[in-house]
Each structure stands twice: as structure tokens, then as C-alpha cells.
Amino acid sequence: MNSLIVATLLLILIGFAYQVGWSRSRQVAPAGGRLHSRPNYHGARVAIWALVPALLILGLWAFFSDAASRAFVMAQLPSDVRAMGGSELAQALSRIEQIATGFGVVGEPAPYESAAGQALREFRNLAFALVVAAAAGTGALGLYLARRRIAPRLRARDEVERVVRYLLIACSVVAILTTIGIVASLLTEALRFFTFVSPIDFFFGTVWNPRFSTVGAGTGEYGLLPLLWGTVMIASIAMLVSLPIGLMTAVYLTQYARPNIRNAVKPVVEVLAGIPTIVYGFFALVTVGPFLAGIGDLVGLDIRATSALTAGIVMGIMIIPFISSLSDDIIRQVPRAMRDGSLGLGATQSETIRRVILPAALPGIVGAFLLAVSRAIGETMIVVLAAGNSPYLRLNPGEPVSTVTVTIVNQLTGDTDFASPQSLVAFALGLTLFLMTLILNVVALFIVRRYREQYE
Amino acid sequence: MNNEHAEVMEMHMPTEKIVGQTDLYSIKSSTVRTPDAMPRPIRVKAREVNVFYGSKQALFDVSIDVPERAVTAFIGPSGCGKSTFLRCFNRMNDTIEGSKVTGRIELDGADIYDGSIDVVELRARIGMVFQKPNPFPKSIYENVAYGPRIHGLASAKGDLDRIVETSLQKAGLWNEVKDRLHEPGTGLSGGQQQRLCIARAIAVSPEVILMDEPCSALDPIATAKVEELIDELRENYTIVIVTHSMQQAARVSQRTAMFHLGYLVEEGPTDKMFTNPEEKRTQDYITGRFG
């Protein structure tokens, strides 16, 4: 309700300020002469000058209101309650909060609670009115000052453009700050984990046996290598499946297919990319796994239904559209002149593709490959369902394995105590995963960028 | 000629005497070699060639003879069908979606659109140089060796080296690149790249070389070098060149064919075309009245 009122007031302020700026600039326009900026820029400039101070006041209040309310409530409380401290005080404060918001409390409120709650509500209403008045006042002041400066030579357009630029910078900063925040939280939690287990044991340990914290004391063993091996094995199988199929699909679609076939096939291939990974997961579990196990029986190999092979193959299928549409774009960027030059020398179509088009597109394809690998490494749902969750170092892809992502899921689902190494290890694993995909992405971007320069 | 053309001719019909002709002639006479006196045997013969892109007809009933070891130039305003016609000679139009060619084109008496003709072999006999230099993103050596490799022309490494060297020599590029054969071909200047493309075409020992505006992306100095090269190459090769520049046609060719709106307007010895054309439209185009 309150925020609705504030938003409405702000909108009115913006509209009014814009109007004021617009009409004032028309007034000051010299007869027959010209304003430096058109009236709509003057309007926008005044609106910005009115809006920014008002928003600042509101932002400050949003930032400090909790601390202010708390200080106010504490001042209302009898000294014995204030002296309680700890969880009892916190409980009292939350009861008062609930009384103040009209939410109600369990049981009969103590007289001091009701009084404090009532006072808090009044305090808040008053504070809100004051803040809105202050915001409106500063907004009006900003508007007035901005209006006074309007003159024919005032460079309102430049000012507005500058503000637009700051706005855009602010938006992109949000993404960057989020990334930094995620990395920071991963890092701090991972560091907490490393107070329990030494990084050497973690990164070079070959046994993964964390034991559940509920079972009893003892921290267990946290060797990363079995998980890393599982991840690498499944990602490798996935790439072995997806790279040839995806690349050849792209070659067919760009070089051989007639437009009507291309228009029909391309969307169908891309539908694969839209299937939720959990669906791939049970496709692997229910169909591919038993099928592979059956084939294994036929040829005398012991292949388990849930294994690195099952998960890898299905993940490969999932990545095909990723590879094919990236390679498609890259192959199309190879100039037609290359192709004509080769065909004009009497090369066949497949010679042209093999000897000219693919080599020319190679850096881009490598970039696409690395991006796909980082997807394969981070993929979770398929491996949770189909890889068998068995964190042992095994060479045979027909055996179940576990991966970094699966282990993170295992460690963080169910009852978790975020102070135990059993949970904290998830952050160390996440950090490892993040670093791996980060490096792959950086390398991929570097390669793709170098490739782009080649034909410009 | 049909009505449509009569109209176009009227539109551009000059009423006063031709101007600019003497200028053009002075350019030509100062640079070109003595034209052939002897008639040469016919190498490529085209009869009533029509080209369609989808439902649109780009070329109408074009018939022409291309003499051996001479330069034949195709001139005409943009969109007149000269490049389209050139691309019929090595069937490069096949690579364009929805294109259709009718009529006959004979190379040494055999119809190149006959089902028994192998396009790969045909393109080895009729080389092509494109408008924009298009070296492959490989080394200079590999660019020239590309054709011989795919056609298996060199059995030993030494043979390939020799082919690369002679091709680059014939293209007048050897001295400029002999010390950096293994650097990328894309690192050369525009004019050098175009001569590299010519060397690449020569390396498969073609009989005919098609050039599609080979100098349009080059500066005047590089253009002069390529023109000089074309003049040398006609000792051994039959060359067909499409050009926008009438001076270029006058400088390098022995025969000229003028195209307009998909029709062959006129064709004959270059000297005659530039001094005494039969068709008014040729005269108008040559003197810069349209196009």
C-alpha cells in the first residue's frame, strides 16, 4: 500500500517536472532564435533533477528504517526486558513487530508489548509521512533549481545523455556485482570448509566418503579426484557423441541441405535444446540405460544400466543442438568466396568442406566445443538420475560413477547443518566447478575473438 | 532484337556526334600491344545460352565464340548478365540455388552441360579468378599447392615445389614471396593476393582462365600489374575477362563483347568495338552516355 502511494507520487512528480521543464524552455526560447536543446530534453532534465533527490531520500529511509525502528522500540521497552538480551529479547522484539503490523501474536501480549507495538505503529506512520514529505520537498526543490537554470544555451541534451549513460552503467554493474557476490560467498564458505579439511587432502585425495553428520562424529574423507574423474569421463563421452554429430549436422545444414529442408530440419534439431534436462534424465534412466545394458549382455560386456556411459551418451544428445547451431553460425561466417574459390579450382564439395571451410572455421568450432564442454561439466540432472552415484575411481565407463554436481546435490539436500564439513564441502566443490568452467569459457572466448578478427 | 531493346536504344540515342572517343583511343594506343592479325581457332563456343535464376531470366539467347590464346572481354553496365554468362563457362552457376542454364556451351567441341561431363574435371580445365581476392586462410605455398594436391598432379614433394614455383613465377609474384612461402596468404596486399589467386588458378594447368572483374577491388598500381600479367598470360592461355572498366577492356583484350540487360549487344575485335561499333548502344556505353 505504502509503496503504491510512493510510486504514484513519484510518477506525478516526474510528469509534473517534465511538463514544467518543457513549457519553461519554450518560454525562454528567443524569438526567432533556437534553443540549444529541444524542449523534450529540457523536460527530461528537470524530471531527472526532481526525481533523483526524492529517490535518494526514499533510499536512505529504506536503508535506515529498520535500525531506526529498532532503536525506537528499545527506547520504549522497560529496562528489565532490555536487560534480558539474547533470544528472549529477539522474541519480544518480533512479538512487538507483529503487534505493530496488526498481524497478531500467540497468547496474551504483555502490557509493555502492546504499548510498544502501538507506539511503533504510530512512529512508523509518522516517519512515513515525514519521509514522503521530505522526498516531495527535495524533489520540489530540485525541480525549482533545475527550472531556474533553463536558458536558451543550456545544454540539457548533454546532461540527459550523461544520465542515460550512468543508468546503463549501473545496470551492467548489477550483473558484475552479482558475479562477484557469488564468487565471494563461494570463497568464504569454501575457506570455512578448508578449516576442517586441508586443501591438499581435498584436491588430491582419492577417497570420497564424507559420512553423514547425523551418523556421529568424525569428519570423513573428502577426496575430490573420484568426483573429478567421473565428471571428466562423462563430459568426454558426451563430447565424443555430440561433436561429430553436431558438426556434421551443421555441415549438412549449411552446405548440402536445400533451403526448404534446412527450414524444416533446423527447428527440429533445436527442439532438442528446449527439452528440460530432467526429461533427458529419465529418458536415460528408463530407456537408454536398460538398452545399453541389453547390448552389453549381447556382446558379453558388463554394462550397468546407470553408468558413466548412459549419462554421457544422453548428455551428448542434449548438447548436439548446442554444437550444431553454434557451428552453423560459424560455418556461415566463412565467406562464400572461399567456397567458390575452392570449387572453381575443381575441388568437390566434400574436399571444399574438409580442406577449406572447416579449417577456416576451426578456431570458432574450437570455441564452440569448449563452451559445450563447460556445459557438460556443469550439467546436473542427467547425471543425478543416470550416472549411478558411486564416487569411486573406476576406469570402466560401463560402471556407475559420481560427479561433482551430483555430490553437491547430495550434500545439500535433506537435513543440512551449514556449520559441518559435510555441507560446507559443497561450496568447495562448487568453487572447483566454477573455476573449471570459468577457465574453459575464457579460453573459448579468447579463441572465438581471434577468429572474428580474421575476416574483417 | 525485340521491341524492348528498341525502346532502350531510343532512350539513349545520341543526337549529336560522339564525344570522348579520341581520349579513349589515346589511352588505348599508348598501352596495348599490336592486336592479332591472324584469326585464331575457336576454343569455347556458346550457342543460344539462356540463364534463369528462379523465374527470373538473367541471360537471353547469347551466342559467342571465344578464340584461343587471346583475351576476350565482356563489358556492359551492372546487372547486364556478363558475370552470369562467365560463370556458365565453368558451371559455377550450378552452385547457386534455383539457377538453370539452357543452350549449348562447347569446350573443344564437347558440350559442357552434357550429362557425361565431370564438373570437377571441367573446372580443372577452366580456371577462375574472382572479383575480390579470395586466398584461402592458409600459407602462400598451400594456396598454390591446393589445386595440384586435390587433382593429384604432383607425385613427389619436389614436383609440388616446382609447380608452386612456376605458377608463382608465371603470376609475377615469385620474387615478392619466395622468402615467405609459408606465411599466410591473407597477409599479402590486395594486388598480391589477386596475383596469388591467379597463380592458384594457373597451378592446375587450365586451358581457359575466367576472370570476373579481377581488378575491381585493387588500386591503380596493382591493377596495372595485373593487367600486365593478363597480357603475358595470353601467350599460353585462353582468357575471358569481365570488366567494368572500358579502358581496361581496351588495354588488355583482343575481342570485346558488349552486354546489356541480359542480351549480347555486339561482339567483335576490340579495336573495331572501340572505334567503330555497329550498335548505337555500344557507342553510347563506350563514350559514357549510360551505364
From Swiss-Prot, chain B:
GO terms, biological process: phosphate ion transmembrane transport
Compartment annotation: Cell inner membrane
Protein name: Phosphate import ATP-binding protein PstB
Organism of origin: Chelativorans sp. (strain BNC1)
Gene this chain is encoded by: pstB
Residues engaged in binding ATP: G76, P77, S78, G79, C80, G81, K82, S83
GO molecular function list: ATP binding; ATP hydrolysis activity; ATPase-coupled phosphate ion transmembrane transporter activity
E.C. numbers: 7.3.2.1
GO cellular component, one term: plasma membrane
One family name in Pfam for this protein: ABC_tran
